[in-house]
Amino acid sequence: MTKKFHTIIVGGGCLGTASAISIARKIKKNGGDPNSVCLIEKMVLGGGLTARHSGIVRAANADPTAAQIAKISSDMWLNVENIWDAELEPDRYGAIWIAKKDSNNGNKKWDQLEQQLKSSNIRFNSIEFEKARELLPSFINISDDETFYHEPDALQYDPADVRRALYEAVRRSQITLEEKTEVLSFRRNSSGNITEIVTSAGVMKC
């Protein structure tokens, strides 16, 4: 039997789940059924988080546009309860960036990055060796020929907590979740638009 949905999202990671939640919220706001949004995941929701993700959210980036997007992302993670309707608290350890000193006992490239990030309202400051030693755990070895930069607003999330929040967000959003479901192929109509997805659990129409 073919299942019918308004929208099908393939991939149950953070991005796929966030997309499904957003669409379901829009449908519900317009008087529709949020259950008509289906999220397909070939394994389990957020399964890749513990395998590939350290849970670090940071904004510092050499590309100005990427840094601004990352800053928006960081702010959204801090506001995730209002976006996903699920509680998720980060550890606010910050991050220390370490670079080799140049012949002038500094690092011009990183100093330029510091100024560039400041113009984007991203806190990223050069710190002395002693301050870096104070902030870093003792098992991390550092030396005087290195220069240090502190990003105090970097966040770290426990991947297990993120997965729990993903499940809670999907439940509260009333999204249809199809786990352990592999996408086998797509079917298109005469206009070339995808209208059906063939999965290991059957055909789904959208």
Q: What is the role of each PLM region?
A:
Residues 43-45, 132, 166:
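Short beta-to-alpha linker loops that shape the active-site pocket of alpha/beta-hydrolase fold enzymes
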Residues 41, 128-129, 179-181:
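Short loop/edge segments at beta-strand edges and connector loops
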Residues 150-206:
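Helical element adjacent to the flavin cofactor pocket in flavoenzyme catalytic cores
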Residues 2-15, 38:
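Beta1/beta-strand and adjacent pyrophosphate-binding region of the FAD-binding site
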Residues 24-51:
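Glycine-rich FAD pyrophosphate-binding loop
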Residues 54-138, 145-146:
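Dinucleotide-binding Rossmann-like beta1-alpha1 core, especially the glycine-rich loop
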Residues 30-35, 87-91, 178:
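Short helix-terminating capping/connector loops at secondary-structure junctions
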